[in-house]
């Protein structure tokens, strides 16, 4: 299986989800001055910001990470978290990233996710990597 890369704010909701998921993952640092490079194809797991609108939905740290062409070239899919209180815009960072980078929006979950979300993501990530051509 290939990589998961995620960002979690100081609320740690996405981090707790990733810990429960139990799959190898790299965290995009909270400190915007810290940089990471990913050398293999990955699925990005990202929270949605901005109170339900598209503007500001993607965290700045994630934008900076994806502005690095090396990292951007390796994204293969996106999973988003959010808050259902934002109606149709919940998890909208996934939609923004999927459209901008031409990758599939694989799943969305609320806040820290449920056990059902954990099971669905584990299964979905495994199936996704099995179906993706090796050269991707």
From Swiss-Prot:
One of its GO terms (molecular function) is FMN binding. This is Protein NrdI. InterPro entries: Flavoprotein-like_sf (IPR029039), RNR_Ib_NrdI_bac (IPR020852), RNR_NrdI (IPR004465). Pfam families: Flavodoxin_NdrI. Signal peptide: none annotated. Belongs to the NrdI family. Probably involved in ribonucleotide reductase function. GO terms for biological process: protein modification process.
